[in-house]
Regions:
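Noncatalytic, solvent-exposed loop/strand surfaces
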Residues: 29-394
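Bacterial N-terminal signal peptides
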Residues: 16-29
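N-terminal hydrophobic alpha-helix used for membrane targeting or insertion
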Residues: 2, 22-24, 98
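N-terminal secretory signal peptides that target proteins for export/translocation
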Residues: 1-15
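Helix-centric, low-specificity signal for extended rod-like, repetitive segments
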Residues: 4-6, 26, 34
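A periodicity- and composition-biased signal for non-globular, repetitive helical segments
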Residues: 10-13, 19, 47, 52
Length: 394
């Protein structure tokens, strides 16, 4: 159960930014010896691995390898078998002009850190300037996804690109060239559903799109102005009768769509105002959604039709994680918000169990954006300036 305090078990410093992703890869590679981590937040998008990872590491301790990247990136690495895939970007000058912007996808050998291949995705059309909040995450924030044969990567206005495991480009599909009114850039990650690659292109075209895995052909497109500022990754709910729904959180609403057609099945009004950056969390037929700057969180039961605000909203709360997607574990939701406060809330009621400032996190600014993951019963949170924190879940 969740206790009314948090205690840091370990804190590990991060090496310079150009190598930071590779420390995560090292830990993630250990996690994935017994299981693949094929998408954002791993299997089922739950952020939980069964295997153990080290409690301590440094430049020399518990570090199997490190590999220099072409530039920074905010996406998570993914792992399939002996391959690690990670993205980054380069070519942004000191004035913030992205005219020479290049995105990169790397395939790295998990055992040695050797780069098997690297592919460059050149800028296609105008891109948002590197200024304001875009500097907080950059141009490589969308985690790739793989089905074990092909790796799919989303590069915002440069589109969705599919590569074979040998590095051959299979197809490339544009999903829009627009910008939101904030000009914050893209953040949502791809998910797979059957033969479809599903992309939240809210930033690029105020749409969610499904592409055919084999060809990149657009199968359906769901559009709506309400999608603006919806930066989270959609999720899939499997109902008790076997039917499935695609769910996504957006400002003031949660949507349930038919993943085969994109048709809107139901919607629920919420108090998730402002930008909505956290991704939905799915547990059985329950969807948990957290707001961004405006705050708020909500639990909604899937499976309804039409406006389900009065019938399917299970609870609402004023607390939020701002950017991070909380971790659901044994009936509790865990996260550290952007100000460095650790939270635990009841998944059944939304009631706050504890809120505590983490002393090891530097105050000021926004020190935490990363979503927590769990390995061997411990919670790992990567901070922006204070390394990686390891905390108990109980």
């Amino acid at each position: 159960m969740c206790v009314k305090q948090t205690r840091v078990l370990a804190r590990q410093q991060i090496v310079p930014a150009i190598l930071a992703a590779m420390l995560a890869v090292t830990a993630l590679g250990a996690v994935c010896r017994a299981e693949d981590w094929s998408q954002f937040r791993g299997s089922g998008a739950r952020g939980i691995a069964r295997s153990a990872v080290p409690l301590a590491w440094s430049q020399t301790e518990n570090l199997h390898w490190k590999t220099r990247l072409p530039g920074p990136g905010s996406a998570s690495p993914i792992v399939h078998g002996e391959r690690v895939f990670v993205t980054s970007y380069s070519g942004v000058d000191g004035n913030g002009a992205p005219a020479q912007l290049v995105r990169h996808l790397l395939c790295i050998d998990r055992a040695t850190g050797k780069v098997n291949w690297q592919r460059q995705i050149a800028l296609e059309g105008p891109e948002d300037s590197y200024q304001g909040y875009l500097t907080e995450h950059g141009y490589a924030s969308n985690t790739p996804v793989t089905d074990g044969q092909t790796v799919f990567a989303f590069f915002g206005k440069s589109g969705v690109v599919a590569f074979a495991f040998d590095g051959k480009e299979l197809w490339r599909t544009a999903v829009g060239k627009e910008s939101s009114n904030r000009h914050w850039g893209s953040g949502a990650s791809l998910i797979l559903h059957g033969d479809l690659v599903i992309c939240n292109a809210s930033e690029e075209s105020q749409s969610i799109r499904a592409l055919e895995k084999q060809t990149g052909r657009e199968v359906w497109k769901a559009e709506g102005a309400a999608l603006e500022l919806a930066y989270g990754t959609p999720g899939i709910v499997t109902l008790s009768d076997g039917k499935q729904e695609l769910v996504v959180a957006l400002p003031e609403e949660v949507w349930g769509l038919d993943p085969a057609t994109g048709k809107l099945l139901w919607h629920a009004d919420t108090a998730l105002t402002g930008n909505v950056s956290p991704s939905v969390i799915v547990d059985g037929e329950t969807i948990y959604a957290f707001g961004g700057r405006g705050g708020g969180s909500v639990a909604v039961k899937a499976g309804g039709r039409g406006d389900v605000t009065k019938s399917h909203v299970l609870w609402t709360s004023r607390v939020t994680s701002y950017v991070a997607t909380p971790l659901l574990h044994e009936g509790h939701l865990y996260w550290i918000d952007d100000r460095g406060q650790a939270f635990c809330s009841s998944a059944a009621t939304g009631a706050e169990v504890y809120r505590q400032r983490v002393a090891e996190i530097t105050s000021g600014g926004r020190p935490v954006y990363a979503s927590p993951i769990m390995a061997d019963g411990r919670i790992y949170v990567v901070t922006r300036w204070n390394g990686t924190l390891v905390l108990p879940a109980a």
